[in-house]
Every structure is written in structure tokens, then in C-alpha cells.
Amino acid sequence: MARMIHCAKLGKEAEGLDFPPLPGELGKRLYESVSKEAWQGWLKQQTMLINENRLNMADPRARQYLMKQTEKYFFGEGADQASGYVPPAQD
């Protein structure tokens, strides 16, 4: 049976993650309060940030930037947007 949580990002009951997606306290916090659906949304956002900002994931500063963006995306005012990105129009 799926583990249900109240998702901090979506504000509704949803299926929780199967395991902490990151090490440390942030990973534990994400595991306890982020749904699979919200995590998939973050992975798309993260990919855009990596590509648009040409982040080198071997660089500790790039990894630190993404950790801060992860926390802002789920628990803060929202992560940075990729420059020039326009979300698709909703029909």
C-alpha cells in the first residue's frame, strides 16, 4: 500500500516518496512532506536550471545552488525560473 502524506508543495494528500531523495536533514524533510507528483515537477524544474545556467554538477557551488533551490521550491517562495522560459498556455 502506498504511503500517503500531506504534500507541502501541492497542499493535498498524495502518494509519498519511496525513500529520501537527498542525504541529510533536507532529504528527511522532503521524504516526510513531498509527494511523488511534486518531486517529478521539481526534477523538470531542476533540469531546466541545470541546462539554462550551464551548471557543472562536478562543481560544489553548482550542487549547493541546486540544494538551495530545492528548499526554496518546496518550502520557500519558489525556485528561480530558467531565463526566457514561458510556461505553456492552459487551455
UniProtKB/Swiss-Prot annotation:
Question: InterPro entries under this entry?
Answer: Fe_traffick_prot_YggX (IPR007457), Fe_traffick_prot_YggX_sf (IPR036766)
Q: Which UniProt keywords apply?
A: Iron
Q: What is the lineage of its organism?
A: Bacteria, Pseudomonadati, Pseudomonadota, Betaproteobacteria, Burkholderiales
Gene3D superfamilies for this protein? Fe(II) trafficking protein YggX
Q: Which NCBIfam families does the entry mention? A: PRK05408.1
Q: What does this protein do?
A: Could be a mediator in iron transactions between iron acquisition and iron-requiring processes, such as synthesis and/or repair of Fe-S clusters in biosynthetic enzymes.
- GO MF annotation list: iron ion binding
Keyword Iron tagged: yes
> What biological-process GO terms show up in the record?
cellular response to oxidative stress
Its GO CC terms are: cytosol
The protein here is known as Probable Fe(2+)-trafficking protein
Per the similarity annotation, which family is this? Answer: Belongs to the Fe(2+)-trafficking protein family.
| SUPFAM superfamilies attached to this UniProt entry | YggX-like (SSF111148)
Q: Which domain of life is it from?
A: Bacteria
Checking Pfam families in the record gives: Iron_traffic
Species in which this protein is naturally found = Burkholderia thailandensis (strain ATCC 700388 / DSM 13276 / CCUG 48851 / CIP 106301 / E264)
